[in-house]
Swiss-Prot record:
Residues that hold S-adenosyl-L-methionine according to the record: T144, G165, D187, N229
GN (gene name): prmA
Protein name stated in the entry: Ribosomal protein L11 methyltransferase
Subcellular locations according to the entry: Cytoplasm
An individual GO BP term: methylation
Family matches, as Pfam families: PrmA
PANTHER family referenced in this protein's UniProt entry, alphabetically: ELECTRON TRANSFER FLAVOPROTEIN BETA SUBUNIT LYSINE METHYLTRANSFERASE (PTHR43648:SF1)
Catalyzed reaction equations: L-lysyl-[protein] + 3 S-adenosyl-L-methionine = N(6),N(6),N(6)-trimethyl-L-lysyl-[protein] + 3 S-adenosyl-L-homocysteine + 3 H(+)
A GO cellular-component term linked to this record: cytosol
Amino acid sequence: MPWLQVRLAISPEQAETYEDALLEVGAVSVTFMDAEDQPIFEPELNTTPLWTHTHLLALFEADTNAELALAHLSLLTGAELPEHSAEVIEDQDWERSWMDNFQPMCFGQRLWIVPSWHAAPQPDAVNLLLDPGLAFGTGTHPTTALCLEWLDGQDLKGCNVLDFGCGSGILAIAALLLGAEQAVGTDIDVQALEASRDNAGRNNIAAERFPLYLPEDLPPQQADVLVANILAGPLVSLAPQLTTLIKTGGRLALSGILAEQGEDVAAAYAESFDLDPIANRDGWVRITGRRR
């Protein structure tokens, strides 16, 4: 069915007031969107910052009188409404539309990431089946792609891999499918561990080959290969810990790093690793090396 969509241009300080007021006047959903393509990187813990210029989208049933709803909204907030618009939009099968847009992707020479509902384009390739139903890595972001391509180029036969900040489990599962003996995943988010476990099962990875832990429960064992696709700040602060988790001669791959942050992150690891040239893609970088 169609919906009435109301769009308001607000500041972060106005967000809570207008969200509550819109729900009060009958909105069935309220969504915040970036109005100017402003990225927010590394927010403080336990915060959900909004963009400097934010669009608030509210959906109402199609027979809602837009003028009356907006007038009521102005009364509730006690202020003149900010820049706004209202239009009727047709309903869509959002899930089907999203699924149609998520297509198989190739990384390197052997590895394909294939949506679980899609046939593998190359059945004889290394095909990782993924259900990106939660907001964790799918391969579409440059940092994930950089890590997957690096893994595809490594000889992982018999290796023990640690995926620090495993998210969907995409990197660890890729390593296992590419020949690793075992991969350990750790993440601060319990939902990420659940997503990793589900995706491992989808790829017929036995639980003993892919144990999953919260960071505080991670066993003190060293890996042959460590991958961490998180953020620059944590990568710098965790450098001493991550270094101890890699065997002498072991390999390291770090991403989640903006190009302008690359040198600072590399400097945090340079004392203990022989680092390769930094790989760059679309403003993001990957740092790799081998522990001395």
